[in-house]
C-alpha cells in the first residue's frame, strides 16, 4: 500500500470548472452537476424515500467510488438533513486516489453556494488528509464521513462494512479504466447485502456485464441532460462470508441504548462521546474527583507520529488516528487547549538519521519534512545539535481540555467519586458495584481504565504493562519563549502553555510510587541538555534547584505489541475450549460462534500515544457496538482486538 499522498492536479476552465490533469476529464457539468447527482445517485438509490423511512438510531450507509469534489456527499447530506428523522444517522464511505488540496476543495465549493451549510463544516475539518482511512464526524455526530485515501483496489478490500447504497462515480471508464474493473466490482459485491442498490452514470456494455457477473441486477433508465441513459442496480447475490468467528461482529444488543464507561481519561472520554453521538445515554464512572486525573492529566502531551516506512498496522493506526484527533482539535481553543506548532524529531545519532531518511522517502512532505541543521534551528527558534524530521501538522495538546470537550455532550453523564470494584451481569444488564452499593447499570459497558481493566476477571489475562513516567514543569522565561515548536530526542520539550514549559518524560518499569522524585527531575533536565543546551541556558537550568521543581508522575499502559486493545470481550475460558483445535491446526477456521460476553468492551493499552489512538478507538468501539463501518482497515481492527492474545496463546500452545 502506498504511503505517499498525491493530490489531484487540477486546471480550472473559463467557467470555473475543475478539470483533472490525471484523467483529462471534468469533475462535473457546470450547469447540471447537482441535477445529475440527484438523478443518477439520489433517485436511482431511492434515497428520498429511504431517508424519510429511517427510524431513530437507524443508520443508512452509502458507499462511493470517487469522492472528487464531494458534490455527491453534500447532496446526500442535504437531503438527509431535510428528510431523515431526529436520531437517524448517515454514514458515507468514499474512496479517492487523488484528494483535492484544501485550496482546490474550497474553490470548487464556491460553485455551489446553495450547499454552503454542508460544504463549510467539512472544509473546517479538512486537515491532516493522508493515505488510508480518514474519519470525519459532522453535524454533531449525525453524519460520519470515512474517506479512504488511496487506490480503490487497495482500500476497498480493507473495508469492513455493509453498504446500503452505492454511488459509482469514478471518471468515465475510457478515462479511468482502473475504477471499473471486475476486481473492483467483486469488492462492491462483498460489501453489499441482498437489496443493496446502485446508481451510475455509465451504461458501457462491459461495465454492465461485469456488474451483473458480480451479482447485481442492472437496468438502463432514462438519463438527464446530455446523459441519455444511466444505470440502476440491485444486489441479488449472496451475502459475503463472515469474518473468522473470533473477529466477527457480536450480535446487536436488545433493549435501550444505555451504556457505562468506566474511566474518564482519554480513552473513556472518547468512547463516551462516540457512543453519545450515536444516541446512547452514557454514564461515565470516574473514581477521582474529575476526568483526566491520571496519565491523561499532564499539562501538555505531544502529537507525535512514530511511523514505519513499511505500512505496518501500527503505522496505519497512527496515521488514521492522527487525522481524527487533529480534526477534533479544531473545535478547541488554540494556544490554551492545543497548538499546531509542529513537532521536530532530532536526528540525534546515525541510526536515527537513517530511520528518518527512510521515512522521508516513504511519506509526503505535508506529513513530514527532513530538515538540515540550519533549517531545523530556523523552525525551532533555538540552537540545536542536529537537524531532524519535522511534522508540520503536529503540536502539543492539553489532554484534560480534550477530555472535557468530549464529555461535554447532553447524552453523557459524568459520575465522579464512583470507583467500580465489581461487574455483575443480571438479566441482560451489566451492573457496576463499589462493594455493597450498586452504582449504575446498562446493557453495554466499556472498560477504559488503563491497566486497571485487569481488576475485572474478563480482562485479567490481558497482557497490559504499566510504565511510570514523570514530567517536569519549567517556568518560561522571556528567552525561552523563542521556542516555536515541540522538539524531541529521547525526551521532549514543548513551547510554553501559559507560563510553563512541559519537559519529559522518564521511563521507569519498576517504580509503583507516583510521588515525583528529584532524581527524575534531574534526569529530565539531562534530556533537555540533549535536546538543546541553548534552550537549557535560556531556561536558566544551571540555577534551578531540582528539589524545588514541580511535576507529576503517572503510569502509561501498554501492550506487548504496542497496539491498543480495543473491541468486544469474550469469555476466555469458553474461548479456549471452543477453539482448542487451533493448537493442532492453526489454519482451520471453525464455524463456531465466539463466546462473547455480550455488551462488554475494552479500550486500553494506548501507551504514550493516547492523544493519537484513543479518540479514534472511541469511534472503533462505537462501530463495533452499533454495527457500523469500521473506521480503520479490517487488519488494523483485528490487530487491536482483545482476542488476539488468547488466539496467540492457543496457537503457540501456551
Swiss-Prot record:
It catalyses: 5-aminomethyl-2-thiouridine(34) in tRNA + S-adenosyl-L-methionine = 5-methylaminomethyl-2-thiouridine(34) in tRNA + S-adenosyl-L-homocysteine + H(+). Its main location: cytoplasm. It is found in: Cytoplasm. Its cofactor is FAD. Residues 262-654 are annotated as: FAD-dependent cmnm(5)s(2)U34 oxidoreductase. Its EC number is 2.1.1.61, 1.5.-.-. Keywords: Cytoplasm, FAD, Flavoprotein, Methyltransferase, Multifunctional enzyme, Oxidoreductase, S-adenosyl-L-methionine, Transferase, tRNA processing. This is tRNA 5-methylaminomethyl-2-thiouridine biosynthesis bifunctional protein MnmC. It comes from Pseudomonas entomophila (strain L48). The lineage of its organism: Bacteria, Pseudomonadati, Pseudomonadota, Gammaproteobacteria, Pseudomonadales. The gene is mnmC.
